Every structure is written in structure tokens, then in C-alpha cells.
Regions:
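Surface-exposed interaction regions enriched in Ser/Thr/Asp/Glu
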Residues: 121-149
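Short aromatic-cysteine micro-motif
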Residues: 123, 133-135, 162-322
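C-terminal, surface-exposed recognition/capping segments
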Residues: 182, 260-398
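Structured loops at beta-to-helix junctions and adjacent beta-edge loops in soluble globular domains
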Residues: 67, 129, 140, 155, ...
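C-terminal edge beta-strand
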Residues: 29-41, 145-159
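A short beta-strand micro-motif common to beta-rich folds, especially ectodomain repeats
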Residues: 12-25, 132-142
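Surface-exposed binding patches on compact interaction domains or structured appendages
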Residues: 1-4, 41-125
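Solvent-exposed segments in extracellular or luminal domains encompassing
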Residues: 8-9
Length: 398
């Protein structure tokens, strides 16, 4: 028996009785059914603005506005909105694509999202379980195609923000106290890694599940880079060897990336080149998918965006990214008067001007000719994106 009612938006539980009658072989049978409808007490994560990522805690009930793409803002110069619009109008149902803990525990990864998400009235409602971690929920159309998807970051910490001091001693930005998707910023803890992103894309990929190793030296040991392919109770599949289509006109591969949020799109050509577009005009080379103003492709939760230019003192157009020197340049505490970054320790480095720790979480890079692992250089390298445009000679979105 399915009884459909409006959501109980009041503060109290509603009760009632339903009488069901049916006739069989000339005999009428009547049955009373007691109805109980609990108050709808979900926390509206989009109350202060929509985004592609929402922060939740364990053991809660949440909802968010799924009627608009991302933050409802711009799309850089990608022409995506002109072709596909901002509104989500053809959603039919919600589905959990994946849920995963940082350690890749496949049993506990099922405890991040509790049950199936529900899509109704332009909102997605979901419950969280007993485990922290990350997940992605999608809204699909009646044919089962993904219309849009959202990153759910389940973390019980109070995530805070503070001033970032640049090389000149000025406040360059107000930044989060950890990586996007991280459970902490504790050195040598796998929970500090956060999520991985292809530049300009809104959907996350999971970093390696391997523990940090103190002897990491950048040699890319496979045992230190075990991929995290857990999906919990999700229905999706991780794909790392897909090649982006050769499309020279914006919005190029953006629709493909939205349809396939769990697919890492390799460049159609060998090397670290764009997944987005193979064209050579400014719209293709500098599309502003992440830009000075938050876009619909920005992966950050409400109140945050991808960092802007010169966050770590590298001016736009400067091909040099040298930010550290020889061991002799540092004192016994790992600090150098010459460099902004302290010496490497505990699989990361600290920004001298604030003391913030930046873990070396590695990267994802998979090709058919270099296949060390899906994850690479965990604990030995770090790659941190900004919205800053790069010179044409070094343009890369992968």
C-alpha cells in the first residue's frame, strides 16, 4: 500500500487513520491502517546559496535545491549556458553514484550516505550514516542520463577559514583550513588529502587510499599509490582510461563531463593537455571554467571558490614555479629566509607566512603508455589548482 501525501512542513508529528475496503468473492473486507507522518526536519544546505558541494555531518537529514546548476552563476566563456541553460528541468529521480572513505574501507564506505536519496519538488533529500567521508549524488532524467551531480562532504569537524598571507606579507585571500573533501589537516593522516579534480571540472575523484610513508622520495612506488575505487552503495563506475573527444568548439567536452562525473577524461593527444577543448582561439585556451567570479563549474561549497591569481606568489604568465631551494638554504627548523615554503617534512610542506600545512597528496594520471598506477606520487608531490590563467605554452586542464 502506497500513500502519497504532501511533506509535513510543521513542527509536530501528524497521525491519522485510513480505512481500506476490498471485495472478494462477494465478501467485503475492511481494514484500518494507522498513519504516522514525522515532521520534515531536514537541514537545507542550500539556504545560503546553491553550489556543487555541500558539507554535512554524520547522522543527519539534509536537503538542497536541485533546480539550478551549480551556483546559478556564469560559465566563463564556454558557451555552455547558452546551449544547455542554467535550470534543471528534466530531472526524474536521484541516485547515489559513489560514497567512499579516505582509507578505502569498502564496508564502512557504505555508512556515509544512509539509504537512497530522494528527488522531489526540485530538491534532493538524503540522510547521512555513521561514517565520515565523501559521496556524489546525481539527478537523472527519465532515461537514466545524469542531468547534474553534487559532491556531499561528510565531516564532523567545524571547518573554518583564515587569512592567507602572501609573499609580500599581504592578505591575499581568506582560505579554508583544509583541502576540499579532507577530514583534517593532520600531517601523515590519509584524511588530509581531500579530493582530486581535473581543472575546470566540478566533480571530484578520490585520492590514493595508501597510508603515507616517511621514506617517500618521489620515486612513485606502486605500493604507496593504491587507488581508492570504493563506491559503497553507489551505482556508478570509476573510469580512468576514457579519451576526451576531439572537439574544437565550446562547450566542447563539458556536456560529456557532466554526463560522466566518474570518468577521468584524458586528452585526445598524448601528454598533459586539455580534456576540455582542442581549439586554439581564446575561448578554447582560456575558457574561465573556474574564474575570478565563482562559476557553475566551481567545485567548492557555498561561501568558497577556487583560489584566484597569485595565491602563492606566482604571477600570471610566469613560467617559473621555483619555490624552494637546496637543503643548505634551510635552518634546523626547516625555515628559509629566501623561500616561502618550508622544507619537506611529514609528506608535505608548510607555507612559511602562515604555517599552513599542505600535504603532498599526489595526483591522478593514467595513460596507455605510462601506467604505473591510477594514483601517482602520493606523499612525494602536490598539485594545487587555482583559477589563474596559464601561458599558452603551458596550458593544461588535465
Amino acid at each position: 500500500l502506497l500513500v502519497e501525501t504532501l511533506i509535513n512542513a510543521g513542527a509536530e508529528t501528524l497521525t491519522g487513520k485510513l480505512t481500506v475496503s476490498a471485495e472478494k468473492n462477494g465478501e467485503t473486507v475492511t481494514q484500518e491502517v494507522a498513519l504516522v507522518q514525522r515532521a520534515e526536519r531536514s537541514v537545507n544546505l542550500s539556504a545560503e546559496g546553491t553550489a556543487n558541494c555541500y558539507i554535512a555531518r554524520t547522522g543527519g537529514v539534509y536537503k538542497f535545491d536541485a533546480s539550478v546548476k551549480g551556483n546559478g552563476g556564469g560559465d566563463g566563456v564556454s558557451d555552455y549556458i547558452a546551449n544547455y541553460g542554467l535550470a534543471i528541468e528534466d530531472g526524474a529521480f536521484a541516485e547515489l553514484l559513489w560514497e567512499s572513505r579516505h582509507d578505502g574501507d569498502k564496508t564502512m564506505s557504505r555508512e556515509i550516505i544512509d539509504g537512497a536519496p530522494i528527488y522531489r519538488g526540485g530538491y534532493v533529500t538524503f540522510s547521512t550514516g555513521r561514517s565520515e567521508g565523501n559521496a556524489v549524488i546525481a539527478v537523472k532524467d527519465i532515461k537514466g542520463n545524469i542531468v547534474w551531480s553534487w559532491h556531499i562532504w561528510v565531516c564532523n569537524d567545524e571547518i573554518t577559514a583564515h587569512d592567507h598571507i602572501d609573499s609580500e606579507g599581504k592578505v591575499a585571500a581568506v582560505i579554508m583550513d583544509r583541502n576540499l573533501g579532507a577530514l583534517n589537516n593532520t600531517p601523515m593522516d590519509v584524511g588530509n588529502r581531500g579530493m582530486f579534480y581535473e581543472w575546470g571540472r566540478k566533480d571530484p575523484f578520490t585520492p590514493s587510499r595508501s597510508p603515507y610513508h616517511a621514506d617517500t622520495d618521489g620515486n612513485n612506488v606502486p605500493a604507496y599509490n593504491e587507488p581508492n575505487t570504493a563506491i559503497g552503495d553507489g551505482t556508478g563506475t570509476w573510469v580512468y582510461n576514457a579519451q576526451a573527444a576531439v572537439l574544437a568548439t565550446p562547450p566542447a567536452n563539458i556536456p560529456n563531463s557532466i554526463l560522466n562525473p566518474m570518468t577521468y577524461l584524458q586528452s585526445p593527444y598524448n601528454g598533459h593537455a586539455d580534456w576540455y577543448c582542442t581549439g586554439t582561439d581564446p575561448k578554447a585556451t582560456h575558457p574561465g571554467l573556474w574564474g575570478p567570479e565563482k562559476t557553475i563549474f566551481d567545485p567548492c561549497p557555498p561561501g568558497y571558490k577556487v583560489p584566484g591569481p597569485d595565491l602563492w606568489g606566482i604571477p600570471a604568465g610566469n613560467n617559473s614555479i621555483t619555490n624552494g631551494g637546496a637543503a643548505a638554504d634551510y635552518d634546523e627548523t626547516g625555515v628559509s629566509a629566501k623561500w616561502d615554503w618550508n622544507a619537506y617534512e611529514d609528506c608535505g610542506r608548510r607555507w612559511k607566512n602562515t604555517g599552513d600545512f599542505y600535504p603532498m597528496a599526489g595526483n591522478i594520471y593514467y595513460t596507455d603508455y605510462i601506467s604505473v598506477s591510477i594514483c601517482n606520487y602520493t606523499g612525494g608531490m602536490a598539485f594545487y589548482w587555482t583559477a589563474q590563467a596559464t601561458p599558452d605554452a603551458t596550458k593544461s586542464s588535465a
